[in-house]
């Protein structure tokens, strides 16, 4: 993980911890694909999975939008993947 990309990971983690009921179960893994895209894999506890996805995927979409907006400011491409 490159130190310059840590703010994106930290942003996603901070936003998610404010949404879930069990913030200690939130983890974000980060790696970079060959084309330079930063991939953030978000994992939450089983009880919080539905809360992070939201009705119709709205919460997940909002999280992705905020992180992508931050990535644009840093001239990065980012992909947020919510893993179960």
Briefly describe each language-model feature range:
Residues 53-57:
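Glycine-centered tight-turn and secondary-structure capping sites
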